[in-house]
Amino acid sequence: MENSHPHHHHQQPPPQPGPSGERRNHHWRSYKLMIDPALKKGHHKLYRYDGQHFSLAMSSNRPVEIVEDPRVVGIWTKNKELELSVPKFKIDEFYVGPVPPKQVTFAKLNDNVRENFLRDMCKKYGEVEEVEILYNPKTKKHLGIAKVVFATVRGAKEAVQHLHSTSVMGNIIHVELDTKGETRMRFYELLVTGRYTPQTLPVGELDAISPIVSETLQLSDALKRLKDGSLSAGCGSGSSSVTPNSGGTPFSQDTAYSSCRLDTPNSYGQGTPITPRLGTPFSQDSSYSSRQPTPSYLFSQDPTATFKARRHESKFTDAYNRRHEHHYVHNSAVAGATAPFRGSSDLSFGTVGSSGTPFKAQSQDATTFAHTPPPAQTATASGFKSAFSPYQTPAPPFPPPPEEPTATAAFGSRDSGEFRRAPAPPPLPPAEPPAKEKPGTPPGPPPPDSNSMELGGRPTFGWSPEPCDSPGTPTLESSPAGPEKPHDSLDSRIEMLLKEQRTKLPFLREQDSDTEIQMEGSPISSSSSQLSPLSHFGTNSQPGFRGPSPPSSRPSSTGLEDISPTPLPDSDEDEDLGLGLGPRPPPEPGPPDPMGLLGQTAEVDLDLAGDRTPTSERMDEGQQSSGEDMEISDDEMPSAPITSADCPKPMVVTPGAGAVAAPNVLAPNLPLPPPPGFPPLPPPPPPPPPQPGFPMPPPLPPPPPPPPPAHPAVTVPPPPLPAPPGVPPPPILPPLPPFPPGLFPVMQVDMSHVLGGQWGGMPMSFQMQTQMLSRLMTGQGACPYPPFMAAAAAAASAGLQFVNLPPYRSPFSLSNSGPGRGQHWPPLPKFDPSVPPPGYIPRQEDPHKATVDGVLLVVLKELKAIMKRDLNRKMVEVVAFRAFDEWWDKKERMAKASLTPVKSGEHKDEDRPKPKDRIASCLLESWGKGEGLGYEGLGLGIGLRGAIRLPSFKVKRKEPPDTASSGDQKRLRPSTSVDEEDEESERERDRDIADAPCELTKRDPKSVGVRRRPGRPLELDSGGEEDEKESLSASSSSSASSSSGSSTTSPSSSASDKEEEDRESTEEEEEEEEEEAEEEEEEGPRSRISSPSSSSSSDKDDEDDNEADSDGQIDSDIDDQGAPLSEASEKDNGDSEEEETESITTSKAPAESSSSSSESSGSSEFESSSESESSSSSSEDEEEMTVPGVEEEEEEEEEEEKETAMAAATVVAMAEESMPPAGGQDFEQDRAEVPLGPRGPMRESLGTEEEVDIEAEDEVPEMQAPELEEPPLPMGARKLEGSPEPPEEPGPNTQGDMLLSPELPARETEEAQLPSPPEHGPESDLDMEPEPPPMLSLPLQPPLPPPRLLRPPSPPPEPETPEPPKPPVPLEPPPEDHPPRTPGLCGSLAKSQSTETVPATPGGEPPLSGSSSGLSLSSPQVPGSPFSYPSPSPGLSSGGLPRTPGRDFSFTPTFPEPSGPLLLPVCPLPTGRRDERTGPLASPVLLETGLPLPLPLPLPLPLALPVPVLRAQPRPPPQLPPLLPATLAPCPTPIKRKPGRPRRSPPSMLSLDGPLVRPPPGPALGRDLLLLPGQPPAPIFPSAHDPRAVTLDFRNTGIPAPPPPLPPQPPPPPPPPPVESTKLPFKELDNQWPSEAIPPGPRRDEVTEEYVDLAKVRGPWRRPPKKRHEDLVAPSASPEPSPPQPLFRPRSEFEEMTILYDIWNGGIDEEDIRFLCVTYERLLQQDNGMDWLNDTLWVYHPSTSLSSAKKKKREDGIREHVTGCARSEGFYTIDKKDKLRYLNSSRASTDEPPMDTQGMSIPAQPHASTRAGSERRSEQRRLLSSFTGSCDSDLLKFNQLKFRKKKLKFCKSHIHDWGLFAMEPIAADEMVIEYVGQNIRQVIADMREKRYEDEGIGSSYMFRVDHDTIIDATKCGNFARFINHSCNPNCYAKVITVESQKKIVIYSKQHINVNEEITYDYKFPIEDVKIPCLCGSENCRGTLN
């Protein structure tokens, strides 16, 4: 211490130390204060210096001898071990060598997952070194991404294997090996940039991307590729900037990824929202391009991608991007042959690249091929397949052969990555085979480059997994994401696809939409969309390759495929795949090669233009469209469809044939456009991209030159492209583009529309779609443009044909093309296999790919904008035109109204317009459902119309019941979009009728006479039937007239009609019009034959009416305008004819004809589509509603409505006929109004249907004797003649199935011929033909005679010459002339011949009409075959179109002798009539036996026209179900038909035979027939209303519904007095008589006599309706009594299709299945050359019928809202009838419950004491609280009073039981007593109340304190509970708060004397159930509540 430094010691001041001298002398070095006085008191300071000397000499202090360290040494003796951790080797960007895959990236983690949780989760798989969860640096939000570094590679791999795609905290997590964390960083960037959310992260694609070892590598590769110009932009894995498309996207890297890792679409493929389209909505295409930057890639992809951007993009991007090779392959594929590649490639894949490994080898071959046109094709096909294949491992291997980037890349990469995407590359392959390496060696280097790119860039990782391509999923993952990641990526992608596919609907970026979804869904999504097709396609098309992928793909596909609107595009590509399937093997070498070359060249060009993308996309979309419905078909068809990208839908439509024939189609289609266009394509590549981008948009037309390339790729663009591919196609194609993409795709409309509405919910089976397409296409007739047809036929007679047909339709319904690939244009192949693309130069264009991509993006954007604009415009037009039509109709109605007092029709007509609005809304709704604005959203051309119409199917079903409910028709059919609207309007009409039944009844005759028949009153036999007909006419009159007019001027008028139709049913109408135009030519002769005397237009109209009514009407209409118009025309014309018959009397035939024509023109627009939709729905509704007047009595509510609808339709039709001079439409309106009138009465007499029938008929006749009288005839005639259609419709149902097709067709033919007599033509046809035609149809011979019988009796033109017309009936040749016209359609079915009607259906009509579908059924007249009736209808026979199995056939007819049994449907005369006429023949068999019925019925048919049978049927509805099974079988067939166009054509039927209208719906007629079987139908006959109802119901409901439709039959019978007979002309009489079902007495053989009798009995016949009750009682009543057998208007093809495919919505019952099977077998026997039939294999399936008969849906009391949404509707007024019905029951229940459950919630309800105490108390509490006396005073009083209790006692009270009495005087305002009890909550109080009630405690002692608490004094409390109520109490209760507790205190209100009872006012709330008050006070209220 002393040594311590001086500073330690105070520097000793020398003075202090010892002696001063010493101190001074010694220079101490240190000193220490030894003693401090401050510490030791009493001492002096003592210093020690240098340890030796002290300042004070003191002996006690010794100097320090040894200086040592004073510190304790022990501390330093311990040794601490120091562990220096060995520094770990860090693997960073500078790390050299293979990085051990120990790092695992987690994505999509629940944001609740934290490090500890993740560590615990991972450590079970191995030691975890590091766990890091990434958060957003700004928001610190959990990004769902985590990094886990394992100590061992095994642990990491196991963790990935076990944790990937597992659910953690509710999230399916994505786990992948991320060696360098690149994927994680990508995810991080995507999330931080805000492009994706943790759950939308495109892990699949990113996975594919991440697998690539280093992004840098990828970038460099991408850059290299870019430099090379291969697909660097599109393929460069790392060239984010390189990718042109990428450039647009924020995540250029994504693009780079796309480029780098084409496998992983990354942002696009990944579905990353941002990158999805790389900027443009079609960015997807762009991104597509970017992924496959080379134009070729783009082009190849463009068609699909652009168009199907979403799907293709997704698929392609995912699959493609994932597969590096895909990238370059994409280009290759694209360049090689977008479609061809697809087809070829698919083939190649299937053949060569069956397995992943083979792919590699093959890929080279493919690549080589790709270079050559065939290889290119192969590559393309391969590529396309790849698009699908992404899930199939083959793709990755394919990339290895980058040498042939086109083939290989397209093949492998595309197959692996994405079938669709692969095709894109082919174009590039030529110039730059490898997408990755653009120049390299085009042949050799490209593959390596591409491989190297894929392997090197991303392929390195991707390629190592490439071998996995066989798995598909693994391949994708491995290929794209690298060894580890690829698998996860694929799975993730697939998962994403499945999950997000649907979510992301980049509607406009078709592919993008799909892609986006798929992107998110990962390539699989895109793949899946294609894969879905591939799935089946893979199986067929690419056995090995595809096979694996399809399953995987399918799921994703499903998700994506579901995008119905885009399906077409998807379908295109998928179709390519699908077609490829068939063609893959064949097309690859031949057609594919040329296609490949063309495709490649063109694709390259187009690729540049984005065509490739469109192709892929479109194909995707097309496939989607088709694929969604029938994935298999798509897959099969893809190879060809790719060629006819535009055709995809069509192809899809005929998947079956398409699949097999698709290849051909592809080749043929493709060749057409590609040969000319492909070479030129390169120049227009940029434009094509727009087209590809938006194949659908009409804007594409400019790009057509580029489109040729796109053509293969882009279906829609191909429309323009067609010119190059096929000169003929161009015309078609160009038109197609003009049509709004989603607006006019007839084919699409047919499939998408018919199926569209229901599509989403009801994927169509391949067979189903094939059938439907076949039918529709057949109905459409050969494609308007032979080129496509030729190509299609050449390519695939069946599949392609249909595909082509749609394209033909497409021109009219560009919407096909528009919405998505939309062109049903197989004709516009995506590439022409026959025309090799101009070298693979497009590939060489790779260098420009970025530019091309950029251009494509712009073009795509423009195309999207155009498409959107067009769609919007189209929608607006549709709405506007509809509004205009509505306005026109209103004006017409007003005019008619001025002519006729009856205004019900007006209302109804107005209502119908409403349907149009509804249609518009439906369109929008459909569009919305369509998943976006894109073509997909539009339904691809079916688009608006299709989408709108689909709902109508449902609505119609519902309508019959609604009609029954007086004014609830609207409600009844809440779900039908368009049809529903129509039906709604009809319902409203019916409602109007119901509202003014008497008025109408009184007024109707006049109004009918005035309005319907200016000269003659209504032709309507029965107010009901004719009314219904007129109602239908109103709805269908316009449409029908329009159709008629259109028919007349089909060529010239067709356009306008079409325009209007388009407005209404853009696509469907167009197709129909086309078909009508074709059929019109046929019909023209018919018309001339029918009504030679009439003016051309008038003639046609009249004849059409006749024909339409009986048979020709539908035919004519169909010819003229298509199903909808045809339907309208039929109704109108049919009515017109009948009216003319009356009119003839009043010399109004000409005018009427003219009017009909004019009406046709005017109404056509509005009504045509409305008719198709509305008419089918409205007509049917109206028929049923109008007929209800007659038959409603039977089925008061539903049937009544149906009848009313039918009657209204009939009346409307007649009014239109009679009022033609005034204005067809006005007349039509009149008709509608008139029907209302009759309907009104009918409805009025709902209770007494019989009365109503008679009354309606009588009234109508009185006011419009002629009309009414004729109405009976019309009913008969109409039903018979027009009914023939209806009968045929029944045929479709029961009769129609047997008779419908054959008999009706025959009848229709006959009628068509019959019209040949100018005078007789119209009405004669209707009258006579109806009956005979059915007979004629089924048993050609027997039917002919019956027709004669029928015809002579009722000559339409001249009342006096009914017979001549009848004889003409046998001359059904005209119908025969119209192959499109399916017998059912033209004849009674209007649907069977719906072929023509079908035209209304976008794609279905032609097929149906053509021959096979519906027609075949009726056309082939096989004596023993159910479809022998087809023979009766040569048109059908000749049509040779594939017919839907159940569509036209009269199931039983085959079994029954064609001559007799087939007539069965016609036989459905009213029971009475049947008995009267053919009772013995038809009635017994038909009525009594369900199945036999058809056989017997045909026989009776001759005698008893369908109308009579149907009439009889009305009652049968109840029987129907029993009979239905046998007879109903046909119904199912009809049901099939329903889908086709039953709704539309039926309107004609409706108008013709209002009552019959319902039966037409297929089962309905069958039901009627079934009813007929029960000869009892006599009683049933009165139930004619029932028939109508049955018919309606039948139509609405499969078989159950028919019973309600039956009622419509009776309406005609309503004609009341003979006076009518007198008034009505002879012709009218004839009509009426047949309408009456030819009295039982007359047989078909006796028809002539009967006709004479009818003439005599016409009045009686009217009365027969009256006698309906009698008829019911005595079915065999005289002919007069028998109500005219309502003939149900044949359903339009569209309606048939709707009904047919309605099974997707309502399921199919055993009966339908049975009849379908029968029909199928018969069709097989007949072999009418229906291609689809050969592709169809009957496989048993349990019935899926969800609901039984919807007989009286209304009866449940719950009314369905028309819109299907109660919120949007508000509420409907309730009919008194309904109200009484439920009020009584509810009252009973209400009263009873209180009795039974006194203690329930209202213990005191029965008696005051039982009243719910809680309520009472609550009320009292409220009151008490309201007495807000000062709390202080209350509390004070309470406290004061509490001390002084009042003396009270309880004794028996005179008021009630016990009471509380005062034992001492109580002053006013004093506390008497506190209400004491248990303080309980409301819930407990309620429980106790119930318990007390159960225990028998009647009184309630619960007093509510406040809202929450109640005091229960029931079992514990004080005397206060005994206080009784008094209306003049002496106390009051008050709630006061004491110490925060609420208490109920009873205060005296006044002075209370001793022994005075304490009372207070319970103040119960006012309630319905009153509790009597027993207080007896002077001012007693009498009740406590």
From Swiss-Prot:
Disruption phenotype: Mutant embryos show growth retardation from 7.5 dpc and die before 11.5 dpc.
Chief place of localization: nucleus
Transmembrane regions listed in the UniProt entry: none
GO cellular component, one term: nuclear speck
Region of interest: Disordered: 1-25, 234-304, 353-710, 955-1480, 1519-1624, 1658-1687, 1786-1819
Amino acid composition bias (Low complexity), ranges on this chain: 366-381, 522-535, 650-669, 1032-1055, 1087-1097, 1143-1178, 1205-1217, 1402-1442
Domain SET: 1846-1963
SUPFAM superfamilies on file: RNA-binding domain, RBD (SSF54928), SET domain (SSF82199)
Biased composition (Basic and acidic residues): 484-512, 986-1006
CDD domains xref list: RRM_Set1B, SET_SETD1
Alphabetically ordered keywords of this record: Activator, Chromatin regulator, Chromosome, Cytoplasm, Methyltransferase, Nucleus, Phosphoprotein, RNA-binding, S-adenosyl-L-methionine, Transcription, Transcription regulation, Transferase
Biased composition annotated in UniProt, kind: Polar residues: 242-258, 264-273, 281-304, 353-365
Acidic residues: compositionally biased ranges: 628-637, 1058-1083, 1100-1120, 1179-1202, 1247-1261
Record domain Post-SET: where: 1969-1985
A molecular function (GO) term: RNA binding
Region of interest called Interaction with WDR82, as start-end residue ranges on this chain: 67-97
Residues annotated to bind S-adenosyl-L-methionine: 1962
Compartments reported by the entry: Nucleus; Nucleus speckle; Chromosome; Cytoplasm
Name of the protein: Histone-lysine N-methyltransferase SETD1B
Source organism phylogeny: Eukaryota, Metazoa, Chordata, Craniata, Vertebrata
